[in-house]
Amino acid sequence: MAEDRSPEPDADVCIVGAGPAGAIVAARLAEAGHDVVVLDAGPRFDLSEREEQLDAHLRPGVEGEASGGGGVDGLWGMGGERDAYTSSGSKGYPLNAARVKGIGGSTLHWQGMVMRLHERDFELQSRHGVGADWPIDYADLRPYYAEAERELGVAGAADNPFAPPREEPHPLPAFPPSHSDSIFADACEALELPMHSVPNARNSEPYDDASACVGYGTCKPVCPSGAKYTAERHVARAEAAGARVIDRAPVQRLDHGPDGERIEAAVYATPSGEEHRQEARAVVLACGGVENVRLLLLSASDAHPDGLANSSGAVGRYFMDHCFAGVGGRIDRPTRQNHVGFNTSECHALYDGEDPLPGVKLEFLNYAGPSPVIEALHADDWGDSLLDTLRESYGTHLAVGALVEQFPRAENRITLDRSTTDDHGNPVPDVRWSVGPETRQAIERVNEVQRAIFEELDADIDWVVGPDGTGPAFHHMGTTRMGTDPAESVVAPDCRAHDCDNLWIAGSSVFPTGGAMNPTLTIAALSCRIAERLDSWLG
């Protein structure tokens, strides 16, 4: 029997996207008694098939029905006509390498690091004359950060001397430093780089009906145990409270009323080729920094000729990501990292400087080196010789990474490429991305610090990711920025669109700046705030 994907009558809210932004809003509004419908372009992934996905990830060439192949994108079914895109910037942008369309969104394969933005991130223009200011400050978001940490089940500690002020402890204790963290510790102390724990959205002890982390070490791209947070938890809560979540229902456009000021319906397709209109009193876009833009542009009309909610011309502009900088190599003693799949220590000492350079977050990577399976499959030797090679190449690696901030630049943007279409005949997103001189300078500076750490350890450097080799961390931000001036921004401080009374936008696309902190906790905090405001608006 075919699954029912017909629209829901009398919906209060239609949410587009079932990643963390949409799922948190859905759960909170459904639990408040509102009629909620969630539409997502991707499928539901069966929790029982996570072991098969793990096998596909660890064993190249093993392909399961659920996995679609051994690659990160293949594990979650990304690629093909449905997910087509183009990249026309000065740096190619591999969009599908780190996004997932499906119930749970990109939390299905994220690493799970969740730190708060610093106070300077909200006041970059006022403090340093660069970037932009947020229309809200850290104090406005602070209580919602605490809510978000409880919602995600964050394991952390108050040991970061550079962190913004807190109001309560993290819900779970921090994970202890890894063995390789202890190797870095003396070098960092000598260089006056205080190390501290990393807040993680993974259970250090049982929480929210999920077990503690058991150390598979494959957090990215798949956590078989369920200890790492995924938005599936909030989807389950939303459905338990009466929300309806429809998968494989890609929204084609948003239809508005005669005056163009209110959204009437989200028009979505189904696998059977039907097209439906989901009407609702309010609509929340929560499908990421690329697809939020694409849907607004696809919804162009006589009333909104440049795209919905785009009277400012800012929709799609100011696309930001975090750039990676790193140094890796080997040391003459075991690092014992094979059981760790996430970061347990980092350093924010380079973040809040007085100069106007982008922020930098140092990360001590629990990197054990290339997989022994892959090494063995590609080796030319056998037997004891192969074993000696594997022992020499595995478990002695060290790496120090960094996330480096990008300032918002209008020329970095998401547009529609009308020369290429998806499986429904719609123009695909085009990503135009480049790295500015200030970010290149910050990468050069952090590379110097990373090299100094290796020199202090007397470790050999095998590779460096610098300004020319940098790539994205796949944190899509800034493309529907918030602000108080409708001529310069897309949404107001409450994340409601300036141009449409009943349209809210959730997620990192509303960030005016991105700092150098992983964005998901801020996404979750803003989603808690949106749900509170929307609950009041619905009455």
Language model segments and positions:
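Conserved redox-cofactor binding core of oxidoreductases
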Residues: 62-79, 86-87, 92, 113-116, ...
